Design a protein with these regions (language model features):
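Conserved, well-folded catalytic cores of nucleic-acid-processing
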Residues: 100-103, 107-110, 151-162, 179-182
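Cytosolic regulatory/linker segments at or just downstream of nucleotide-handling modules
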Residues: 160-238, 246-247, 252-263, 267-273
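Amphipathic alpha-helical transducer elements in NTP-driven molecular machines
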Residues: 51, 94, 146-152
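Catalytic core of nucleotidyl cyclases, primarily class III adenylyl/guanylyl cyclases
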Residues: 63-92, 108-147, 171, 199, ...
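Intrinsically disordered, low-complexity, charge-biased linker/tail regions
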Residues: 273-285
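Catalytic NTP-binding/metal-coordinating core of nucleotidyl cyclase/transferase enzymes
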Residues: 4-95
Length: 285
């Protein structure tokens, strides 16, 4: 899929890059193959298929994220969608994500979900950086090129690890923080400082919190304890940090607490590093 009206620029220009991806897509596909969601067929009416399901997910994502806009580049990757936006579109992107996540919650709250159709969960990764568009004669299409394209994909790929739905880089946060602070529908929480797999420079990650998430208040209420635990983690107080992270997991039910507690255990058994600065080097995508 290519938006033929977008202004493809061969020179680098600052853009916002968004990846959103359907989680558990392989499990959903296998469930369809086992006719778990086939429902009841009636004369002239076929059962709901995986092809129809994934098309509906893509079409809804495309429409709610408004990827057909003339200044937006959009492309479908398997069960996910990438959108590339002008750098001044931060507020516009927040509104679009809000609509899509609200639509997703309405869909999942339907009594028929899990019976005739699968529940869905979509993860997001967003960053900002320089992008150029290169024309490929092989498929006669323009394709985006830029480090931030890979960065957004990596961020989305680890969003589930942190129990985060919308994971964003500090680069995108700088564009969006003014809107986040002034709109009560949104908030954010600090997540981590890491080096993404295949990258060389550290990045700071935040989760964009949205009030249509059932755990919106839970995540906001956990931020003070998480900040305390993370400070101890940075000071190499592994035992105390692990206990606090584990408490976050147990009391708030947030997976990030368990992830960070296990990381502290690994670090406590590793040789002491005098240059430790709290930055974790990711080994997985």
């Amino acid at each position: 899929m290519e938006n033929n009206t977008v202004k493809f620029l061969p020179d680098k220009a600052k853009r916002i890059v968004l990846f959103c991806d359907l989680r558990n897509s392989t499990d959903i596909l296998m469930d369809f193959e086992q006719d778990i969601y086939s429902g009841i067929e009636s004369p002239g009416v076929k059962a709901f298929t995986y092809a129809e399901f994934i098309m509906d997910v893509h079409e809804t994502s495309y429409k709610e994220l408004y990827l057909g806009h003339e200044n937006t580049y959009a492309e479908i990757y398997g069960d996910g969608v990438m959108g590339i936006f002008p750098e001044d579109n931060a507020k516009y992107i927040l509104e679009n994500i809000y609509r899509l996540t609200k639509r997703m919650r309405t869909y999942n709250d339907s009594p028929s979900m899990g019976v005739f159709k699968p529940r869905i969960d979509i993860g997001f990764g967003i960053t900002a950086g320089e992008v150029s568009f290169i024309y490929y004669p092989l498929d006669k299409r323009h394709h985006p090129v830029g480090r931030c394209v890979h960065e957004a994909a990596r961020i989305e790929g680890i969003s589930r690890l942190y129990d985060a739905r919308v994971l964003i880089s500090d680069r995108f946060f700088k564009f969006a923080e003014g809107y986040i602070y002034t709109d009560q529908r949104f908030s954010y929480r600090f997540i981590d400082r890491i080096i993404l797999k295949g990258f060389r420079e550290p990045i700071t990650l935040f989760e964009l919190l949205i009030d249509n998430d059932p755990r919106f208040e839970i995540k906001k209420n956990s931020m003070k304890e998480y900040s305390e635990a993370y400070s101890m983690y940075c000071r190499r107080e592994w035992g105390t940090a692990a206990e606090l992270f584990q408490k976050i997991y147990q009391e708030y039910g947030l997976g990030i607490g368990s992830v960070m507690a296990k990381r502290c255990d690994v670090l406590s058994k590793s040789p002491s590093n005098p240059d430790w600065n709290g930055i974790w080097n990711m080994k997985d995508k």
